Amino acid sequence: MAAAAELSLLEKSLGLSKGNKYSAQGERQIPVLQTNNGPSLTGLTTIAAHLVKQANKEYLLGSTAEEKAIVQQWLEYRVTQVDGHSSKNDIHTLLKDLNSYLEDKVYLTGYNFTLADILLYYGLHRFIVDLTVQEKEKYLNVSRWFCHIQHYPGIRQHLSSVVFIKNRLYTNSH
């Protein structure tokens, strides 16, 4: 999904009126937002943080210094690790790492829903939608997290719902 489409989804989920126009610059199509009263903003996470502040929902950026750092870490991860990686091996490595990380967490920061969850959900959607039932079970923690985020009010919108089976079909023993 193009960054402009993600930012439009984010705007809608934040309850903002669709007044922003996005363009893309460079070979990698980095999103650009021209603000009404200042310089243009460049980059998915920069623009997303601006939209969160515009919607007066700063809690999505983290409530403590540690949580803010974790949100920033996962936003950076989204841009550096998820975007631009489309080989099946890259994605499975990413899902394996994320699965381990989410083992004891509800959300990326632990117990609070943040912008990092939203943007990572949008970034992973195109990959998760193509996983087999067996792959979804292999990455059980990612599947749990993803299913939880897609059912969070206002997040999924027009994106296809990914079906997860509640009872495991496969066991880890071979």
Swiss-Prot record:
Q: Where is this region: N-terminal?
A: 2-56
Origin, by domain of life?
Eukaryota
Question: What residues bear N-acetylalanine in this entry?
Answer: 2
Q: Name one GO biological process term.
A: translation
Region C-terminal: start and end of each range?
Answer: 64-152
Q: Which residues form a coiled coil?
A: 153-169
Q: Where in the cell is it found?
A: Cytoplasm; Cytoplasm, Cytosol; Nucleus
**Which tissues does the record link to its expression?**
Down-regulated in various cancer tissues.
UniProt keyword list? Acetylation, Coiled coil, Cytoplasm, Nucleus, Protein biosynthesis
Q: Which Gene3D superfamilies match?
A: 1.20.1050.10, 3.40.30.90
| Pfam families named in the record | Arc1p_N_like (PF21972)
Function according to Swiss-Prot or TrEMBL: Positive modulator of ATM response to DNA damage.
Q: What is this protein called?
A: Eukaryotic translation elongation factor 1 epsilon-1
Q: Which organism is it from?
A: Homo sapiens
Q: What is the lineage of its organism?
A: Eukaryota, Metazoa, Chordata, Craniata, Vertebrata
Q: Which gene encodes it?
A: EEF1E1
